[in-house]
Amino acid sequence: VVGTAEAARGGGPMTRLAVLVPGGKGQVGSELAAILDARREDLVHAPGSAELDITDPESARDAVEAFAQAARDAELRPVVINTAAYTAVDAAESDPEGAQRVNVAGPAALAEACRDGGMPLLHVSTDYVFPGDADRPYEPGDDTGPRTVYGRTKLEGERAVLESGARAWIVRTAWVYGAHGGNFVKTMARLAAQRDELSVVDDQIGSPTWAADLARGLLELADPVAAGTGPQQRVLHCTNAGSTSWFEFARAIFAELGLDPNRVNPCTSADYPTRTPRPAYSVLSENAWREAGLTPLRPWQDALGEAFATSGGAFRHRG
């Protein structure tokens, strides 16, 4: 079961939060906004990039200052959860300046604004900061070694956030899918409607992570961070439990769609070359998350089942 701060405290009340979510129209940001809206006692502002450009230091500072004042007026504990990112892995290779602006300059400006405004920051990062050639799940303190522009800029963004001196926690995740935006689940549903058979790589291993579960995990962490407990800075990993290949994940998606999983065939990465190398193994360890007193996310298979049960229409291809 996905944990909440309430569960972590044995059923005690959660801190009433004021949460600013840059990147609020994306996969994770949309889920954060929905959960906080449903809680009703919290204040949430989840602007998209058109409303809040984190790459503009003045825009970031104004947004943080205004939200901090709104939190004070409502007598809520403020926290920023940054989900804004340049996530187009292949496009980043030909647009390194764009990736640098969003993944490095943006988080740096946001972190400096949070530092000066006295607001804690949770910054979402990625498994791509690692080389992707491990034989065991990556721990937060393991050596990084990104092999793509996307991964390099995300790692530089992490460092900029931590070096700002803000109260900041980095949360790395992987293989995210959800009802909003483009993702692997939606791609498989679209291709299933267009082709009799598909070939999907079976030599890349990771942990599929439902955006709604990740959002709940981030909010569980936001509770003590906003309350001022725990260390000033930390790096954690948060994904749904377990691991699989893209091939097996695709088969599971077909099953949820009510289709024959045998329509999906395995292939190697060499059979399906991409412009940018993908990690062969990028499973992230939950040990540090658990040691921080947080509830590990449920197995990826259970999350996928609920994603289809609650948001299935968003994943099914139309037309």
Predicted regions: what they are:
Residues 94, 101, 105-109, 116, ...:
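Catalytic helix-loop patch of NAD(P)-dependent Rossmann-fold dehydrogenases
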Residues 245-251, 268-307, 315-316:
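Conserved C-terminal active-site "lid" loop/helix of NAD(P)H-dependent oxidoreductases
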